[in-house]
Amino acid sequence: VELSDMLIMTAIDNNVVEATEILGDQAGRTLDSITRDAVSAGTNVIYAGGKTSRKTLADEDTLKPILFEKAATQLKAANAPKINGCYVAIINPYTSFDLRTSPEWIEVHKYADTTPIFQGEIGMLGKVRFVESTEAKIWKDETCPEGKAVFSTLVVGLNAYATTKVEGGGLQTIVKQLGSGQDPLNQRATVGWKAIKTAKILVEPYMVRIESLSAYSADVEAN
């Protein structure tokens, strides 16, 4: 983001600080998207409603507790290790809406006193704990029912996937003040970020992707 000297001098707000905050949020979401796209390519898929493909999902094929019982069973059968005693589901806010009215649902505050919670955790079904994220994958293309978005809920065990750790390649926010670089008249400041990030599925049987529709499928776009 480039900021002019006139903007910096005349604006009431500190635009360098604001740009840094906005780019920090964008950087986090971008890096999360890289991980999401990598892990969403797994081969173990359960389609809601007993369907056999994404294209054949219908309006009634929303998330239901039985789907997570099936996912947990598959993970246990594969000897997938648990994370703090449970498997973890990464769920979109739109599809978590479909589960919250289930009688089996346990809100996070009912067990948080005895169990450390994950950031974004919203509740639990059986031995599956749910972490809500807007980065959970959504498709809306020719592979989906016409005009409908399909949502991914990823259920994972320990060591199902990994992300990169490169020395010196972590997220860096870089602020250049007026007069930096090719700016002889001190007219431009810049704020930006850079990072190295990739993700890889390590053990396919240690993750299960559940695909479903939602009450919001007609209104939501892909991410």
Identify the residue ranges that each predicted region occupies:
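Alpha-helical scaffold segments that mediate packing/assembly in large oligomeric complexes
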Residues: M6-A78, Y94, S217, E221-A222
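Glycine-rich, often proline-containing surface loops adjacent to acidic residues and nearby aromatics
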Residues: V1-D5
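Sequence/fold signature of self-assembling virion shell proteins
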Residues: K55-A72, R100-N223
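Short loop/turn segments at secondary-structure transitions that flank enzyme active sites
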Residues: L7, R29, P93-F97, A136-I138, ...
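Aromatic- and glycine-enriched pocket-lining scaffold segments that form the walls
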Residues: A80-S96, R100-S102
